[in-house]
Each structure stands twice: as C-alpha cells, then as structure tokens.
Amino acid sequence: MEYHGTRLPARARRPEPSWPTVIATTLRLWFERHPVAGRKGTRGRRVTVAAAAVGAAALGAGVTLAIVGHTATSARVGAPPSAVPSAAASAGSTGALGASAATRTAAASWIAGQVASSAVVACDPAMCAALQADGLAATRLLVLRTAAADPLGSDLVVATAAVRNQFGSRLEGVYAPAVIASFGSGPGRIDVRAIAPDGTAAYRSAIAADRRSRISAGTQLLRNSRISVAAGARAALSTGDVDPRLLLMLAALAVEQPVRISGFGDPSPGAGQAVPLRSAQLATLRSGPQAEPSLRMMLSFIEAQQQPFLPLRASLISTSALTVEYAAPGPLGLLSGP
C-alpha cells in the first residue's frame, strides 16, 4: 500500500498551561525523582522552589509564556519495507535529476542524527532509500512516487532536484517555505524543508511571532541574576536566535542552581536565519569539590524532562562543562506573548 501525502485530520489542541504552571510542574517532577538526602520537609522545599520559579526564573513580569501542546503535523505514515525501493533500483529512475551520492549520503546522515524520531519525512524514492539505509524506519517515510503525490501529512520534505522539479514553485510557495538544513550546491543541492500544515502565510507569520517571543525571553534571561552568559553567547539571546526549548529549560534550570551559558551552537548546515540555535554548552558557577557534583545534578535535571523539553542528547564534556542539543525541527508557538 502506498501513501501519497493525504492531509490528515487536525488534532485538537489541549488548553495551554501558564508559564508559572510549567516551571512549577518541571521542578516538582524533578524533585520527586531526586529527593534531597538527609533533609526533612522536602515537600515544603519543593513548594518553595517552585513558587520561587515564578519570580526568579520567569522570563519577566508582563510577559506571559505558555507551553503549546506540540503535536506532529501528521500521524506516522505506515508503509511496508518493500514499499521503499533499494538504492540501486532508485538510481536508475532518478538519473541526472538525482542528487550526487555524496550529497544524498550527507543529507541522510544529518536527518538520521538530528531530526526528531517522531518526525515523518517526505522524500523521493532514492532519498527514502538512503534514509532507510541510515536507520530511519519505513513507517517514518512518505514516498513521493507520482506527480499526484504531495508532502502534506509529513513534518519535513527532502527537496532533491527530483522533488523540486516535481513541485516547482509550489514547493516553497505552498508546502514548505523554510529551509532548516541544506547540502551541496547547484542542481544537485538537497534542502531539508519544514512543512507548513496551515499554509505558507500562516507559517511565516508564526515564524515572525516566534522570533519576537524569543527576543523577549532571551532578554529576560540576560537579566536573570542566576544566569551568567559568556560574551559570545549574549548576542544570540538578545536577537532571538536561541531555540525556545533551550530558553525555557535554562530558566527552569537556573531556579535549581546558578548556571553559566558558555555558548550556543548551530548543528544545521546551510540553515536560514529563521532557524534558531538548538544546542548549548553549559557550566556550573560552583567551584572546587562542588563543581562536578553540581554539573551532574544539572545533567540529571535536563535528562529528567519530558517532551518537548527532553533533548535529543545531553552529556558531560569535562568535569566543568556539559552540552545539550534539541532535535530538529524546533516547535513554533512554544513561547507566546500577551
């Protein structure tokens, strides 16, 4: 059975919890999983810290932040493994329109390593074969086989030369206006594009609103006395270039203990300015014997999160620093202003 990108019914969104509720819940869950050894009245401490989150880590009075129930734009698309052709069979059918093997391999590797495991990816047969070879399950692939197919129902579309020729101006103008990663150049270029389920006008409006919210949130983090920011990282916060999941996680983490932001990273090659930075290097402000235990507590806090705040990966890189990275694509509307 083949799937041709039929739009699936929209899922009803749950009511959006307030920012104080989000912070309080985050901290409550973490302290429930990590009780303070040798201290009585732990429950009282949880309540006190969660309440302090509203004043100490909220991203500023007058700016109300809310979590949007981020659901995938489509249900997972099922297809038996046999529905995805082998790389050898696909090569002949795509011919000169196919991207070079090296570019296709680089794009497949990035998607396998950076894209959320829940994301459905639309692709031409050759690209789908490369993605399957890199470990993506067939249930995550929407194969664009015919001229009647469209990428709606997926979260991302891999725009090879074949896909660009198939959809023409509709690819950017109707289905997928934003490039979140790009590989190669010229006719063989491969772009990874985010699908706009509600249309390109609504998507572009959401991107603009999201940047405004990220600027506001980042500015408030810069004013947070429990967060130290390296000079090179300050601009990313003030210009709205940081992923909202990082912004919210850092605000919650700062309530638990002071934190230093050493820098933000961009693991998305060729991404446009609309794509925020999804990774950060963090350090503890505690020194001496307390430094490493403090860092491990930070890592435990990060790893205890639930979606959409559970990162793609997080690890210690030394006794004084850790890295955290979120998956692509980042959610829009995770921060909302008044």
Question: Where are the regions a protein language model picked out?
Answer:
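Terminal targeting segments of Actinobacterial cell-envelope proteins
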Residues: M1-V47
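Secretory targeting and sorting signals
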Residues: R45-G69
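C-terminal region of N-terminal signal peptides and the immediate post-cleavage residues
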Residues: G60-A88
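Glycine-rich phosphate-binding "P-loop"
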Residues: A79-T103
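Loop/turn elements at helix/coil->beta-strand transitions in domains of secreted/extracellular proteins
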Residues: V115-V120, L152-S154
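Short, polar loop motifs at secondary-structure junctions
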Residues: D124-A129, A161-N165
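Extracytoplasmic
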Residues: P125-S154
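Aromatic/acidic, Gly/Pro-rich catalytic loop(s) in extracytoplasmic/lumenal soluble domains
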Residues: S154-P338
